[in-house]
């Protein structure tokens, strides 16, 4: 694996000079191998090690290199044709392979090659970009988008129209991460490498980036870039220092544990916020 990483790191340093026409065989094979390993879930761009999320930057570099070494090509779809550098993940799947891998894909959901989809996942008409990882038992609902290299945990529900930000455009240092057992409400956006920790519930229409203030109304604490585990979050506003105007924020209205979540439905958690 170290040898593979070394090839990727070396190629990335000279990426400006690499084209589909002049890329060397060693680099092409290394990039293709990484994309295949990401696609199968054998590798992932970020993983939790000793309780901390670690981003493997060299894997992200391999994803970026894949755009340098490949020409656009025609991609056939059921209702149309497309023209892109990245093949679709399910282009060569037959019924037996879908059954073996154990997830459902509802048309016209689109998943790029290099994204991993785990067992018991349901993809409604949605989009999952290259390098993303969607873990077991999760639902990517209609018109939701999982951005490049984003990490989605087990038993996560991404509601209709949710946007989970990617790292490639614009280039971000770390992927956006939604940990296990989270619920992200309709039309919410989580971007710029924000981490939503385990068991959190994000209400409809909440927008969280690195500069968004995440205000805990019980403690008065303000978080940036991280939603603490077990938080129930709604959109809100905080006053300016001079009191003349207010600015958008996300508000943690309560904290819940796994026991409470198992007994209380998501809708009830969001409706009883006073």
Swiss-Prot record:
Pathway(s): Amino-acid biosynthesis; L-lysine biosynthesis via DAP pathway; LL-2,6-diaminopimelate from (S)-tetrahydrodipicolinate (succinylase route): step 1/3
InterPro entries from the UniProt entry: DapD_Trfase_Hexpep_rpt_fam, Hexapep, Hexapep_transf_CS, THP_succinylTrfase_dom1, THP_succinylTrfase_N_sf, Trimer_LpxA-like_sf
Membrane-crossing residue ranges in chain numbering: none
Residue numbers binding substrate: 104, 141
Compartments reported by the entry: Cytoplasm
Catalytic activity reported: (S)-2,3,4,5-tetrahydrodipicolinate + succinyl-CoA + H2O = (S)-2-succinylamino-6-oxoheptanedioate + CoA
UniProt GO MF annotations: 2,3,4,5-tetrahydropyridine-2,6-dicarboxylate N-succinyltransferase activity; nucleotidyltransferase activity
GO CC terms: cytoplasm
Domain of life: Bacteria
Keyword line: Acyltransferase, Amino-acid biosynthesis, Cytoplasm, Diaminopimelate biosynthesis, Lysine biosynthesis, Repeat, Transferase
Listed GO biological process terms: diaminopimelate biosynthetic process; lysine biosynthetic process via diaminopimelate
Enzyme Commission number: 2.3.1.117
Record's subunit section: Homotrimer.
NCBIfam families in the record: dapD (TIGR00965), PRK11830.1 (NF008808)
HAMAP family for this protein: DapD
Family: Belongs to the transferase hexapeptide repeat family.
Full protein name: 2,3,4,5-tetrahydropyridine-2,6-dicarboxylate N-succinyltransferase
Protein's organism: Enterobacter sp. (strain 638)
Classification lineage: Bacteria, Pseudomonadati, Pseudomonadota, Gammaproteobacteria, Enterobacterales
Gene from which this protein is expressed: dapD
């Amino acid at each position: 694996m170290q040898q593979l990483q070394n090839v990727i790191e070396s190629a990335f340093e000279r990426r400006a000079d690499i084209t589909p026409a002049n890329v060397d065989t060693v680099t092409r094979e290394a990039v293709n191998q990484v994309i295949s390993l990401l696609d199968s879930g054998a590798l992932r761009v970020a993983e939790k090690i000793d309780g901390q999320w670690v981003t493997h930057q060299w894997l992200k570099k391999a994803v970026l290199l894949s755009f340098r070494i490949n020409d656009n090509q025609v991609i056939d779809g059921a209702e149309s044709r497309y023209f892109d550098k990245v093949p679709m993940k399910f282009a060569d799947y037959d019924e037996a392979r879908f059954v073996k891998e154990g997830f459902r894909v509802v048309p016209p959901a689109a998943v790029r090659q290099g994204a991993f989809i785990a067992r018991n996942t349901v993809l409604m008409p949605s989009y999952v970009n290259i390098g993303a990882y969607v873990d077991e038992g999760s639902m990517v609902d209609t018109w939701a988008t999982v951005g490049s290299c984003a990490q989605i945990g087990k038993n996560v529900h991404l509601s209709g129209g949710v946007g989970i930000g990617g790292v490639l455009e614009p280039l971000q240092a770390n992927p956006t991460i939604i940990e296990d057992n989270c619920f992200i409400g309709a039309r919410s956006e989580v971007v710029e490498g924000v981490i939503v920790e385990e068991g959190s519930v994000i209400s409809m229409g909440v927008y969280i980036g690195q500069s968004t203030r995440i205000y805990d109304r019980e403690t008065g604490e303000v978080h940036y870039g991280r939603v603490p585990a077990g938080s129930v979050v709604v959109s809100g506003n905080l006053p300016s220092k001079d009191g003349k105007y207010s600015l958008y924020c996300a508000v943690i209205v309560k904290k819940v544990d796994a026991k409470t979540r198992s007994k209380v439905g998501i809708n009830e958690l969001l409706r009883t916020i006073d």
